[in-house]
A protein has these predicted regions:
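Glycine-centered short loops/turns at secondary-structure junctions
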Residues: 93, 120, 145, 307, ...
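Beta-loop-alpha module in the N-terminal Rossmann-like domain of NAD(P)-dependent dehydrogenases
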Residues: 51-115
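Rossmann-fold dehydrogenase core element
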Residues: 111-128, 148-155
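Aromatic/hydrophobic pocket-lining residues that form π-stacking "cages" and hydrophobic walls in ligand
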Residues: 42, 85, 112, 138, ...
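C-terminal helical cap and adjacent loop that interface with cofactors, partners, or active-site loops
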Residues: 49, 293-422
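Predominantly a Rossmann-like dinucleotide-binding segment in NAD(P)-dependent oxidoreductases
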Residues: 11, 129-284, 415
Length: 422
């Protein structure tokens, strides 16, 4: 059975990640309405998915002012807009797939939870890592009791030097005053993931972090305000916009990459359009002369209600961008997992180590390790059947990770003082 979908916010998530699923699975999903503040993005998506002009809008508010246009709505706008838009969508009768975070406000999170119960609509938050073959396998191992009761988790998120510069120094999520703190916008993914994997409830949180490097005081001698404006430090600067968006082997347009991150700078990325973007737009600014205030490194410790704990570290100073490592220690053994290599090792106390190659368990590892598509398909199935899949990130479950993030930011701003949850 096909589900009709409206998408608000046609950036790298709404337009590039979720919309193409309608073409991959045309029997399951059809896009029937679109909205974005950038008319060019709306026009492009409308052509791609045959959405009539009368169902295309220049804001989420304009779309939501219409009679109900679809079974479900994908909310892929900025962090501080999510709840306002979702509340109206619930009143209209939409089921909701919402980009994380829910909101930078705990009050708004609870307001949305109450509204979802009132209107009896499904809300799923996009904690996509739950849906990857990699973390699904780890969940299976823990649930089967193979390593016993989980006592300690040590986890690292390597954001990557260029990803940090792109998204959290130059990009949309650089300033917590207009979006969210880093521990909410980026690492609520991880808080949700590890609480879910170990089936734990958080009790107390402490956290430390700061903007260590991406600030004016760290600018090298001769640094210009923009990378293309005769910067004397350009040659040896790894954060140089021309390197990241033009010449870098992984991320640069000249190396054949026309997807993320260059597709954030131009709808149809070419060398010419990307050069124009870094000469005139926000992604060409010097990383030491931006208006960013989110942390570039942070450590968060979580004590759970059963006495177990989670130690989590996030860093923007790594060469291997967007990678995660974890060691999960239980009463019978441990799990060591490297998402970059898709390798999981199980070490029981009295047996040889077992190595699991996750690439042999699935074929699609695109989009957050295969999590993006799988999450959307489970959401569509839930709407069609009315049955909630076991791993689905419902609003109720997602709020736990947000409570940890709110506590972590409060602790960080108070020099690491512990903050109670609940």
């Amino acid at each position: 059975m096909k589900t009709t979908v409206a998408i608000v916010g046609l950036g790298s998530r709404g337009r590039v990640t979720y919309a193409p699923i309608a073409k991959q699975y045309p029997d399951l999903m059809e896009i029937t309405a679109l909205a974005d503040i950038n008319p060019a993005c709306v026009e492009e998506a409308a052509k791609e998915y045959n959405v009539p002009k009368e169902r295309c809008f220049t804001s989420a508010e304009e779309l939501l002012a219409q009679p109900k246009l679809a079974d479900a709505i994908f909310i892929c706008t900025q962090d501080q807009d999510h709840v306002r838009e979702a509340l109206v969508a619930l009143e209209k009768g939409y089921h909701i797939l919402m980009e994380k975070p829910i909101s930078p406000s705990a009050e708004d999170c609870n307001k949305l939870l109450e509204a979802s119960r009132k209107y009896d609509r499904k809300i799923v938050v996009c904690h996509v890592l739950r849906y990857t073959p990699f973390f699904s396998k780890i969940k299976e191992i823990i649930s089967e009791g193979i390593i016993g009761d989980v006592v300690t988790i040590q986890a690292i998120e390597n954001v990557g030097y260029w990803h940090q510069a792109h998204s959290f120094v130059r990009g949309n999520w650089r300033n917590s005053n207009t979006t969210s703190p880093m521990c909410l916008q980026k690492t609520c993914h991880d808080f949700d993931l590890y609480l879910w994997l170990a089936d734990k409830t958080p009790k107390r949180v402490s956290s430390m972090g700061d903007t260590y490097f991406f600030k004016e005081a760290c600018a090298p001698e001769g640094a210009a305000l923009r990378c293309m404006d005769g910067c004397k430090a350009k040659e040896n600067c790894p954060f140089d916009a021309e390197k990241i968006y033009i010449t870098n082997k992984r991320t640069g347009i000249a190396q054949g990459n026309t997807e993320w991150p260059v597709d954030v700078l131009a709808i149809h990325p070419t060398e010419e359009s990307i050069y124009e973007a870094i000469k005139t737009g926000p992604y060409g600014r010097c990383v030491f002369h931006c208006d960013n205030n989110v942390v570039d490194h942070q450590i968060t410790n979580i004590e759970n209600t059963d006495g177990s704990n989670i130690s989590f570290s996030m860093s923007g100073f790594t060469s291997d961008g967007a990678s995660r490592y974890c060691k999960i220690m239980g009463t019978k053994g441990d799990i060591t997992a490297d998402m970059t290599k898709n390798i999981i090792e199980i070490g029981l106390f009295v047996q040889p180590r077992e190595v699991i190659d996750v690439t042999k368990l699935a074929t699609d590892f695109s989009g957050h390790g295969g999590g993006d598509v799988r999450m959307v398909l489970e959401f569509l199935e839930m709407i069609t059947t009315g049955k909630e899949p076991q791993g689905i990130t419902s609003l109720e479950q997602s709020i736990n990770s947000h409570l940890v993030a709110f506590a972590a930011e409060e602790s960080r701003l108070n020099h690491g003082a512990p903050v109670e949850i609940g």
